[in-house]
Amino acid sequence: MSAPAGKAGPKAQKKCKVVTQKTKTVPKKTKQQKPRKVRLQKVERQVKTLKAKTRGPKISDTFSTVVTVGRIIGNNDDSLTRQLKVFVNPLLMKNQDSGSTSSPLSIRASQYGLWKIAKLHVYFTPLAGSANVIGTVSFASLEQESGVATAESPDTIKAKYHAEVPIGSRFVWKVPPRMLTGPREGWWNMDSGDDPTNSVGPSISFWTYLKTILALSTATTTSYLGSLFLIEIRCTYLFSNYAPKPNLAIMVNEKITTTQPVTLTNLSDGSLVMTTTDTRLCALLDNDRGPRGPNAQTNGPGEKFWAVSTLVVDTVAASIGPWGWLLKGGWWVIRKIFGAANTTSTYAIYASVEDAAKDSRIYQPVSGTQTLAAGDVYVTQLTQPNVNEAGSTSLGFSPPTPPAPTGSYLPLPQAAGVPGIPPQYTFSDGQYTAATTWSGTQLYLTGVPATKTVSGSNEMFGVENNTMSRANIDRVQIYDFTTTGIIFLGGQNRSGGAIHTAKTLIVALKTATTKAPWLAADATGTNWAMPSWVGFPVPGAGDHFLQMQNSTDRTTHTTPVGVYFLVAYGATNKLVAFWAAPTDVQAEPTSLMTLYNVDAGRAPITAGLNFTTAMTEYSDDDDDAESDISSLFAPDEVDWKFKIEASSSRHLEEELQFWKSKATQLMLEKN
């Protein structure tokens, strides 16, 4: 609003200028920051240092390989069946039917004391198509505690880390290495004989569930028991702690098709054991008993542990009550029991490797006589007592060691039989080959028998067999060869020498599958008669016999007059020859009695009926034998030289074999 005219307006306000002085701020010195990359490198170095302190021993060797484990076959019923159990330990990771043959992986592993796995892939290659074969599903399960038997079912398998593979599918199962780590910063011990718990490692079990059916047959439901899958494992192992033990490379993995059943029974202390007379199974499981000497084991459990896996178990599982699950699982551990009966082999049964190491047996009464039917049995050797035996490493197939006789073998009447050895055989390259024909002149019997003459009223004596007939006899001479009888090979094989004593022959007749040329006394068409006054029973079930003649007698006999009937009594373990003497007794021999066998009632075979053999001429060995040793070494390794001096060719051969084995062992260690 403006002021009126003639009046002064309000006084204007005076403006003040405020001057502010700027203060100079001095920035604080800050510590220079390190680049982020430098800090990261420092952290990485710290992490690397910590890893080096905690990861365990340094890796000395890495080995990658492919192992063909075996095959899975069809299932005969609707049960859950364990087909294979494969230990991840590199000494045991081999073909399940390789025997004692070493593998590239086992040779490498035997040179170190620690192992672990960097990669493990399981390949299922189908061998049957889903269009033709149906009904079965296959499982693979990882078992962290592989040395312990457990009750198994489809549900327990699916609760573990597992794979489920239908028929006809090609499948790769990749097992994470973190699930295979060992107790020592991820490492496992190599030698399972030192500490089974920390060395055996995990295992992979392969199963089939439900009956396998051949779909091509529409009219009937036909089981298919052929191959379903081929199992291969591609793996990478890490090794540490160089500690060569060559014998660990040849631990046994073998599949045996038994021909004799396995029996479950109890020892006198009540412990559960299995017994068998099967030739191949006994030869394998008893191979640690060795030759009998003053320091040989004669009683108690054997040193070797064996894992046994079989398919045929369900039928007898109920016979051992609460322990039936052990049989149903199809896997257990056994140890040979020494000091048991000689006619059978006896093995203690354990539920785990740890129990076997402590000899903690199962005490459960067996109801009645229970047998596991003959079939396929997988046997895995878990321990090797002698780990450094010179020259024992096998690079190829080696025949099984013949079973050694139990007990003393001198004097010969004390020799005990070995179950399963044939009553008539030839022996070559460690193998017993049983006779397969029933012809004559196959064996000679000699000895100093206990003898007596008995007589009575006329009664029928002899056997009706082939063209042989019985006759009325009033007098019989008896020759008991049980104590002193010796059996020699006869005819064309006579150079084979002595093959049995009377005692070992009786064991062979009881346990062997092939009994030629011995005849069963109760066979169809064989009718025996024995006078009541003889004092011996009429030959029957469990007894065997041969017609024998004096070594100078080449005539054909169709009646019991003039021949010997040699009877092996199974119940009384006696070997007795009976001679019919209706007119006069034989005079006491003026030389050692020798008899040869004749096919009952038929003409003697005189070809080869001799009692000497041609002398073999020995020739000098190859002069270039030493070069066989030098060829094992590389040409540039001039420091490796051997100079073998021998006084004779025979000594050279023995020394040659020794140095060959030593050279092989050294080359393996060097590689």
From Swiss-Prot:
Residues 1-39 are annotated as: Disordered. The keyword Oxidoreductase does not apply. Residues 25-39 have a biased composition (Basic residues). GO terms for biological process: symbiont-mediated suppression of host complement activation. Pfam families: Astro_capsid_N (PF03115), SP2_M (PF20751). One of its GO terms (cellular component) is T=1 icosahedral viral capsid. Specific enzymatic cleavages by the host yield mature proteins. Residues 407-609 are annotated as: P2 globular domains. Residues 1-11 have a biased composition (Low complexity). Its main location: virion. Keywords: Capsid protein, Host-virus interaction, Inhibition of host complement factors by virus, T=1 icosahedral capsid protein, Viral immunoevasion, Virion. It is found in: Virion. Residues 610-671 are annotated as: Acidic. The keyword Ribonucleoprotein does not apply. Self-assembles to form an icosahedral T=3 immature capsid. Belongs to the astroviridae capsid polyprotein family. This is Capsid polyprotein VP90. It comes from Turkey astrovirus 1 (TAstV-1).
